[in-house]
Amino acid sequence: MTGSLLASKRIRKEFGSKSRVVDIPDLIGMQRTSFERFLQRNVPPEEREDIGIHLVFKSVLPIKDFTGTSSLEYVSYSFGETKHSMKECISRGMTYEIPVNITVRLVVYDVDKDAGVTSIRDIKEQEIYFGTIPLMTKRGTFIINGTERAVVSQLHRSSGVFFDHDKGKSHSSGKIIYTARIIPVRGSWIDMEIDPKDIVNIRIDRRRKFPVTILFKAFGYTNEDILSFFYKKEQIVKKDGILFKEFNPDNLKRNRASFDILDPETGEAVVKKGRLFTLRALKQLQVAGLKSIPISEEDIIGRGFATSVVHPETEEILAKAGSLIDPEVLEKIADAGITEFSILYVDTYSSDSMRKTLAVDKVTSRAEALIEIYRRLRPGNPATPEVAQDFIDHLFFKPAYYDLSNVGRLKMNHRLGMSTGIDVRTLRREDILLTAATLVELKDTQGAVDDIDHLGNRRVRAVGELLENQYRIGLVRMERAIKERMSMQEVDAMMPHDLVNPKPVSAVVREFFGTSQLSQFMDQTNPLSETTHKRRLSALGPGGLTRERAGFEVRDVHPSHYGRICPIETPEGPNIGLIVSLCTYARVNDFGFIETPYRIAKDGVVSKQITHLSAFEEKEHPIAQANAVLDDQGHLMNDLVTSRVGGEFEMVAKNDIEFMDVSPNQLVSVSASLIPFLENDDANRALMGSNMQRQAVPLIRSEAPLVGTGIEGVVARDSGVAIVAEHDGIVVDVDAKRIVVKNTENGKGSDDRTVTIYTASKFVRSNQNTCFNHRPIVKKGDAVRKGEVIADGPSTEMGELALGKNVTVAFMPWGGYNYEDSILVSERLVKEGVYTSVHVEEFEVVARDTKLGKEEITRDIPNAGEEALKDLDDSGIIRLGAEVKPGDILVGKITPKGETQLSPEEKLLRAIFGEKAGDVKDTSLRVPPGVEGVVTAAKVFSRRGLPKDDRTRLIEDLEIEKLEKDRDDEVRIITETIQERLEDILAGQALQAVVKKGKKVVVPAGTLVTRGLFEGISLTDLMGLTVEDSSLTEMAHVILEKAETQIKKARENFNNQASRYEKGDDLPPGVLKLIKINVAMKRVLSVGDKMAGRHGNKGVVSRILPVADLPYFEDGRTVDMVLNPLGVPSRMNVGQILEIHLGCAARGLGRQIDDLIYEKKTDELRARIKRIFTTPLIKTGERANKDKTHYDFSSHYTVEKSMAKRTNEEEIQFVDTIDHMDDTEFLEFASMYKNGVHMATPVFDGAAESEIKSLISYAGLDPSGQSTLYDGRTGEPFDKPITVGIMYMLKLHHLVDDKIHARSIGPYSLVTQQPLGGKAQFGGQRLGEMEVWAMEAYGAAHALQEFITVKSDDMTGRTRMYEKIVKGQNVLEPGMPESFRVLTKELQSLGLDINLLEGKK
């Protein structure tokens, strides 16, 4: 068995020197997790967290009526079961959705207005149907109206507080204007700015600005409160005519003394008059216990009062808080006999912005402030303090109207240094005060502002959150309707379901999935395109950016993207940088920030413990790269290590390193990490390479790359296109359409599921019309493990991603046919169907009930000969397997015609041939131009209640037959497994009671249980089984009960599915029958097809050469493709050359293995395979010098020596397995490598040049990787050796057959009468201005006249031309082009009298 397990899995020769510390996470886990968190479907109601749909219900409900006498309260929600399976939804054009039921409580109150008491009168609780929600499939997609759609996650600015400045561009003075913005998820935006006059202004919702202190006063703060929050105070005391201030060393630094400052103990002058206070002097005075120091009046003139100064007798305000001190005020204070007052302390580095703002602000009271703000935001509405107070409370402090979100609160706490609870999701007054304080401090210190492109300030809204927002919009719409119903009708007589109408909610959700910019038609070209589409992040969409307004900075790569967003994969064109991809190891945390994993390092030792950090958690921590040199215990070997600190690269001492990357391919996306030798390619070409892999068409026979990167298997498994075993088990039955596996996970079948039947999809059409087909890769009797691929999907082979083919490529010019990226291809590739792909087109026809009568699907079509009907069955539907070409009938349909006046001849024909022929027209579904293929499927959907035709019944019978087979197999396997299990458990026990089959005794009492005893006895008959050991009897009964439940479930499933077929279908109104026909087309590689490698090396097939003419090797093998060597140097994608060399070695080793298999030299083959796969790579730490210290394959070598040097457990296990295989198993394993040994050269940790050379030599080839080729035309060798090897080439979805198009006659535009444009409209080729010039330049006057008149928009000329051709008079008579008439009419409509003057010369 060990052998067959190894044989079912492809082993690659690994070149990576870094062992994988952490597995690549589930590639579409982000989508699934987000949706699961939104629904919390499998969480009991009482345990649900406040997220997703639960939070939406909690935040919108309870809904109270306008009088407060009743309220509708939320209790819980639950889900029903899906009505149709995913397969049915796709074929019937339905949405895969799940019904939602919500339990609500209607509470009616008695209100005693006089006593002000409210008591509950009545409570009614009810579960209500609340519409449906589309359900995510296992593959992370949604099926909406029969098509698979993916919801792209949005990357948007997170909520919270942000500080920025205008870089001095706004004001003419060039002064930098600092701004702060508080962004909530829901509610009003607050903008603060400091203008050039140092006044702090605020805007709410981008309205007119006003001083921020008005808002503070509206919050209830006085001038003194505001000043004490922003500034320190200094107490001034007047003694004996001299002013003194308290001695505070912090406030005196860098100040000068107004008088001699004396030591209180010795009396000597410590600081002389006019001198600076030094740190030493301040310390001396502090030690001496000095309490106050003398100051002059000049020291405080120009400073501000901290509190208002009031006359002690008259209570007249002599100076307001914040007003400036001048000699007059000081005189007034002295006259009033006031000896103490406090002033503001503003140091030389700070501004008094807030004092200036207070001076500008003319508002004196809270009521005045409230009314002032209300007038600014609601001009025209009458303002009272109460209304204004309520308005401001709603604006910032009510959860229903303002939501900062937990992310916003987290960011605000982080930025303002607060520790407010994360559940406080509204603003607090302190938040606005602190924001203003931080803004002033930033401006004063010229501090660093926030970088809005940093990933700490951008977060991901995944599908769950997007849906949550839509659901809330729907519920708020519904809330208004509920309030109106509560007030209009008598609540006592109502039940909750009378109030709740779920339609607005369902409509919003449906609109989101159908029309939102973020809900996209899924790219299903191949598994990689599916996976990357689900991992895509878009900055566009509602609440995001627009293409036109997005600047360069937003699109650019940022240091915080490292390990989170791929710097390579992004579309070319207007969306560049706005649509990006998640990195391989990245994940999105609960707050929506992207995290990447790191290994924890401490004191120079890197552990295997992993932590995930978001961009702002990473901040200033030194992080070593994945290629940092470690010893076996994880100690960093170099004293100085290259690391990243705050986005910059620095050399850091090893003991200071805190984290280390987990893998070299951590910083690129899935698509980019599939490119071998990515590190040797220019970034622009790498971008093209990763984008073009997504366009590769699945071929008839897929082939995994010989030179891969090692993650092909992960992509194939996670993409969901391959069938993966759900449990450990043994394959019981396999055919092309299904795999039956007996589960062995939990003992022998005692698990809840004893058998799993996997159904394979055959020639199913994908969204991009490529062919989705499963091919089982296991055999009957194979053991399979959970998570193992058991059937390949499109573009997968042996459970690995296989987008293209390994072909022999030569780099050389060939007769100019590979000029400018053209590709020369061998005829062998066409003959053997190497690049042949199957494309499936779906056509549908609808029979409707029209005003004139019912349309009919029939074989009886007027004016159609027997030849046209030969492939239609009696129901008028084409048979499966029929070959069709353009114009052929797929489904015969006739439509009633309106009554017309008949000529006498027609009346006679009617009289002879009956009524039928005349009153119907042929509206059959015919094959459109450009489609030629084989009919692979026909689906018929009939309206419920109408009789079914023969074809429909035949299709249903076949489907029910399949279901019966599945049910019978499942019951049989469960029965056999349970019988065996019972025989094992009860072995040697004597039966205490007889076992009967009906009334007949099958096993008498006292019989000892042996293997095979229960064979042929049903589980129901075994239910009364008893043995001496009561515990064993009990165990046997538990097993039998479980089995009975499984069998019952299998039968129920069959009955449910079978009954669905018998019921008929739900079709749109007026539709009687819907028929869908699938036609599969073979697309053979042809001239004009676009092909590409994985390094951005794209080109178009220019010529398909006969094999005899192609360059060939000495042994007669020809090359498959010839590429232009000039395509490499200027593009700087050298990775393709390294790939070709390594591919050359891989194919050479494969040929050696093939020869040894042919010669049956098993021992030599064993040694060679062990040598290939276990030759030690450079030990970790020698990577930097890899080129100098490589191991030579051809040197004296034994596996034992290798094992001593390498401690890789997998490798030891591999050698052990190979040694224990018998010859048959081993040859089966070895034959996997006949066509080449598969290599894995991971991104940024790949094979070194020296390793490739050594491998080429070991394969018996020239280490230069070049060979002498001979010209197929002459037989002469070419002048110089040529680089030739194996390259992985893809056929892209830009196929010439889909683009080529010809027109003779066709539709014309209504106004201009010119032919339409484009293939879809069956249009013509535009002859534009430049083409006219070209014709003129060649003097082709008559041809040109024909082009722009009779072949275009000369209507009379067109008909004349037709008549002339019919009569054989080929004379051109052009008339007036219609577009000229349109032009003259246009000018006449503008009031210009313009006419064409005709005259003869």
From Swiss-Prot:
S-S pairs: none
Xref: SUPFAM superfamilies: beta and beta-prime subunits of DNA dependent RNA-polymerase (SSF64484)
Catalytic activity, as annotated: RNA(n) + a ribonucleoside 5'-triphosphate = RNA(n+1) + diphosphate
Gene Ontology MF terms in the entry: DNA binding; DNA-directed RNA polymerase activity; ribonucleoside binding
GO BP annotations, alphabetical order: DNA-templated transcription
Alphabetical keyword list: DNA-directed RNA polymerase, Nucleotidyltransferase, Transcription, Transferase
EC number annotated for this UniProt entry: 2.7.7.6
Lineage top rank: taxon: Bacteria
Any matching Pfam family: RNA_pol_Rpb2_1
Any single GO CC term annotated in Swiss-Prot or TrEMBL for this entry: DNA-directed RNA polymerase complex
Subunit structure: The RNAP catalytic core consists of 2 alpha, 1 beta, 1 beta' and 1 omega subunit. When a sigma factor is associated with the core the holoenzyme is formed, which can initiate transcription.
Function according to Swiss-Prot or TrEMBL: DNA-dependent RNA polymerase catalyzes the transcription of DNA into RNA using the four ribonucleoside triphosphates as substrates.
Family of this protein: Belongs to the RNA polymerase beta chain family.
The protein, known as: DNA-directed RNA polymerase subunit beta
